[in-house]
Curated annotation (Swiss-Prot):
The lineage of its organism: Eukaryota, Viridiplantae, Streptophyta, Embryophyta, Tracheophyta. In leaves and inflorescences but not abundant in seeds, roots and stems. The keyword Hydrolase does not apply. Its EC number is 1.13.11.12. Belongs to the lipoxygenase family. Its cofactor is Fe cation. Residues 1-56 form a transit peptide. GO terms for biological process: green leaf volatile biosynthetic process; jasmonic acid biosynthetic process; lipid oxidation; oxylipin biosynthetic process; response to bacterium; response to fungus; response to herbivore; response to jasmonic acid. Residues 79-199 form the PLAT domain. It comes from Arabidopsis thaliana (Mouse-ear cress). Residues 175-232 are annotated as: EIF4E2 binding. This is Lipoxygenase 2, chloroplastic. It is an enzyme of class 1 (oxidoreductase).
Length: 896
């Protein structure tokens, strides 16, 4: 149970007692531990402080039994921790210094894994070393010989501040026992219960030593919130994992225009998010209040100190709402288009002056340049790799097509299997369902090389099809200020050299009260007018892909859909469960980054709504896609490729599938990564579950998967495609899919965002005016014929929208200095098991092999989708990276 008092209230404690009454006089009241120095104060007698007690019942039970005296053995304990950063000198800091001097920093208790606890073995740990960022503590126990192996420890934080406990090592005569903690421990004044940590040895529930079973159960109940007596908002120090709907993205109490529907439930199905316990809004009880401060996530889900203070983490995400008004204030015409392309180029070459006192330099050091003490700072973006390699590549049709296979969103291109293209929407509402892209147009554009029937048979036609997804939103989005929308289809033809060529773009508007359905097909032109119309149509089509990428391929399929796996794992899988330990690296920081996204990215009036074409319908649209298209069994890479017609099963092929497009960089690299992950998971699962009965009888494992399906993804719980955990293959498939989504999938759609989207004409996030050929006026046609470049610039995002997106994409594309890349470091529990350690080393070797393969492929000029003059190399699935914006690196988890 957590006390409601804040730490600040602890500062009012009476500390006026003479220090001489507590301990011998010292020359000064200062912390004797300075960075890099050992504490030279006399240590209290450890033997005297070590407490070994027995219960009265045990004494009475054995009172008549004569036994040989039990010998004690000495056990040394070494603890590594990091303190919470607190600025300045506070009363609580003074009290903590007193605790250090008295040698009572942490209370540590040992838990036997052999027999039920008959005695208590505990000691106070004293801080003996402090060298930023780590602190070292030591303690010594006298443990009875028959105590048995230590299976767990309990720790109570005697400080008046939080402590990040990294790990504990116990040194016994027969060897060492390690406890990897990686957890924040609240002060005793806030949480008086002792925190339990289990050793690095993993146990299935049925194999858990009997004395540890009750602790295993109690810890899960704590994380489920069963021991919480209070009601209301969860506090910063709590570790409760629970579910809620997305009812906190709107802010109706602050502005009625920011009211948003609840996302999650029958009307708008969606994955669940972490519960915060905040009060309902006064103006809309179905929504949750968004008052100031950080959104709750369980304490151990928050960023570490390193990530939290870096410009890629908490600091910038929290500051986005205040950063953007300052940037907007220095733009000459924030709501207007850029006047010419040179003005866009100047964002990289000259920059924009910022007031010296804006305070943005520490937050955005990559893009804010300091010119000197007396001069203003400059907002100047680094040129993205796309225009660094070829300044005009974004204009070319071949680059437009190449990016569907090797760009930012390789998840949308699909094979055309039926002709003609026909909508599945109700024609009574949306008009004629048949596409205007006819066989005559296709055969003309492919120069008579083959008929449509031959192209279908030979799998030569591919499409970006956003028609049925967008058409229901067109009229609604067009009612928003300075925004337009079409439903689009973009058709591509596969050439003999495995490159795609755009054939046609169809833009459609549904009928409304004032006019009938409108649609038109645009093709690459060979005269000035048709060329400009084609470029304008291409701009609309690319913006649709950019919005779909951000909302669906990125946010929905990785961030939002992963959160329920994390919540369920912490509620149902013990920290000593082998599957928890296998998945835990893949869950690092995701809940925190999702909470930040709800605060400033996907919230009402946030970046997505302000700068992307769906506007206030963004999450509503992603809900529609989740309800219609999302299937867990199709989230693995091979299944996704097969679903889109980009591969077919072939057991004789290297990865068990044969690609429809041989030079598909994302798929070619991704399948190697997928296989490496699957082989690692297979070795791991078969080690801990040699008998399939162990899977079906594992109540924690079954409880986790049941909660994922029935609560976390409860809006789709009745779907027939959910896997059932009965066999090794079932479990391997589920775990491999989750590991892939959090690592390879997310890396492929995230870390190239600035490289491809930083120059926004390549990836415009919205379009603001209609095609000149839709209900043309004399004035609009005149402007188009006299200044088509001006019309294109008006179609692009405004100066404000473009600049804010560039700042955001730079942030989202940045690797943190403390990034943990897949296969780079192994968990301590893996290293302690020889079979698992060997399997991990094989996994690591396969990832190193992938790095070499990617390097070789990127210099093979026969692979035209990833190599050639000015072509951006495909490196998004290279496993490791330096920190910063690199366009490569696959972290274990969705950490940004």
């Amino acid at each position: 149970m957590y006390c409601r008092e804040s730490l600040s209230s602890l500062q009012t404690l009476n500390v006026a007692k003479s220090l001489s009454s507590l301990f011998p006089k010292q020359s000064a009241l200062i912390n004797p531990i300075s960075a890099g120095r050992r504490n030279n104060l006399p240590r209290p007698n450890l033997r005297r402080r070590c407490k070994v007690t027995a219960s009265r019942a045990n004494i009475e039970q054995e009172g008549n039994t004569v036994k040989e005296p039990i010998q004690n053995i000495k056990v040394k304990g070494y603890i590594t921790a990091q303190e919470e950063f607190l600025e300045g000198i506070t009363w609580s800091r003074g009290l903590d210094d007193i605790a250090d001097i008295r040698g009572r920093s942490l209370l540590v208790e040992l838990i036997s894994a052999k027999t039920d606890q008959r005695i208590t073995v505990e000691d106070y740990a004293q801080r003996v070393w402090a060298e930023a960022p780590d602190e070292k503590y030591e303690c010594e126990f006298e443990m009875p010989e028959d105590f048995g192996p230590v299976g767990a420890i309990k720790i109570q934080n005697q400080y008046h501040r939080q402590l990040f406990l990294k790990g504990v090592e116990l040194k016994l005569p027969g060897g060492s026992i390690t406890f990897t903690c990686e957890s924040w421990v609240a002060p005793k004044s806030v949480d008086p219960t002792k925190r339990i940590f289990f050793s690095d040895k993993s146990y299935l529930p049925s194999q858990t030593p009997e004395p540890l079973k009750k602790y295993r159960k109690e810890e899960l109940e704590t994380l489920q919130g069963k021991n919480r007596e209070e009601v209301g908002e969860f506090t910063k120090f709590e570790r409760i994992y629970d579910y809620d709907v997305y009812n906190d993205v709107g802010d109706p109490d602050n502005d009625p225009e920011l009211a948003r529907p609840v996302i999650g439930g029958l009307t708008h199905p969606y994955p669940r998010r972490c519960k915060t316990g905040r009060k309902p809004c006064e103006t809309d009880p179905s929504s949750e209040q968004r008052y100031g401060g950080e959104f709750y996530v369980p304490r151990d889900e928050e960023f570490s100190t390193a990530k939290g203070t870096s410009f890629t983490g908490k600091a910038v995400l929290a500051a986005l709402p205040s950063i953007f008004p300052q940037i907007e204030s220095v733009l000459l015409s924030p709501q207007e288009p850029f006047p010419h392309f040179k003005a866009i180029q100047n964002l990289f070459e000259e920059g924009i002056q910022l007031p010296k006192d804006a305070g943005l330099l520490p937050l955005l050091p990559r893009i804010i340049k300091a010119l000197g003490e007396a001069q203003d700072d400059i907002l100047q973006f680094d040129a993205p790799v796309l225009i660094n390699r070829d300044r005009f590549s974004w204009l070319r049709d071949d680059e437009f097509a190449r990016q569907t296979l090797a760009g930012l969103n390789p998840y949308s291109i699909q094979l055309v299997e039926e002709w003609p293209l026909i909508s599945k929407l109700d024609p009574a509402v949306y008009g004629d369902p048949t596409s205007l892209i006819t066989w005559e147009i296709v055969e003309r554009e492919v120069k008579g090389n083959m008929t449509v029937d031959e192209a279908l048979k030979n799998k030569r036609l591919f499409v970006l099809d956003y028609h049925d997804l967008l058409l229901p939103y067109v009229n609604k989005v067009r009612e928003l200020n300075n925004t337009t929308l079409y439903a689009s289809r973009t058709l591509f033809f596969l050439s003999d050299d495995s490159t795609l060529r755009p054939v046609a773009i169809e833009l459609t508007c549904p009928p409304n009260i004032n006019k009938p359905q409108w649609k038109q097909v645009f093709t690459p032109g060979y005269d000035a007018t048709s060329c400009w119309l084609w470029n304008l149509a291409k701009t609309h089509a690319i913006s649709h892909d950019a919005g779909y990428h951000q909302l669906i391929s990125h946010w929905l399929r990785t961030h939002a859909c992963t959160e329920p796996y994390i919540i369920a794992a912490n509620r149902q899988l013990s920290a000593m469960h082998p599957i928890y330990r296998l998945l835990h690296p893949h869950f690092r920081y995701t809940m925190e980054i999702n909470a930040r996204a709800r605060q400033s990215l996907v919230n009402g009036g946030g970046i997505i709504e302000t700068c992307f074409w769906p506007g206030k319908y963004a999450l509503e649209l992603s809900s529609a896609v989740y309800g219609k298209l999302w299937r867990f069994d199709q989230e693995g890479l091979p299944a996704d490729l097969i679903k889109r017609g980009l591969a077919e099963e072939d057991k004789t092929a290297e990865h068990g599938v044969r690609l429809t497009i041989p030079d598909y960089p994302f798929a070619n690299d991704g399948l190697i990564l997928w296989d490496a992950i699957k082989e690692w998971v297979t070795d791991y699962v078969k080690h801990y579950y040699p008998d399939e009965e162990l899977i079906t009888s594992d109540e924690e494992l079954q409880g986790w998967w049941s909660e994922v399906r029935n609560i976390g993804h409860g809006d789709k719980k009745d779907e027939p495609w959910w896997p059932v955990l009965k066999t090794q293959d079932d479990l391997i498939g589920v775990v491999t899919t989750i590991a892939w989504v959090t690592s390879g999938h997310h890396a492929a759609v995230n870390f190239g965002q600035y490289g491809y989207g930083g120059y926004f004409p390549n990836r415009p996030t919205t379009t603001r005016i209609r095609m000149p050929t839709e209900d043309p006026t004399d004035e609009a046609l005149k402007e188009f014929y006299e200044s088509p470049e001006k019309v294109l610039l008006k179609t692009y995002p405004s100066q404000k929208q473009a600049t804010l997106v560039m700042v955001t994409l730079d942030l989202l594309s940045t690797h943190s200095p403390d990034e943990e890349y897949i296969g780079e470091q192994q968990e301590a529990s893996w290293a302690n098991e020889p079979v698992i350690n060997a399997a991990f080393e094989r996994f690591k070797g396969k990832l190193q092999y992938l790095e070499g393969v990617i390097d070789e492929r990127n210099v093979n000029i026969t692979l035209k989708n990833r190599a050639g003059a000015g072509v951006v190399k495909y490196e998004l699935l290279k496993p490791t990276s330096e920190h910063g914006v690199t366009g490569m690196g696959v972290p274990y988890s969705i950490s940004i």
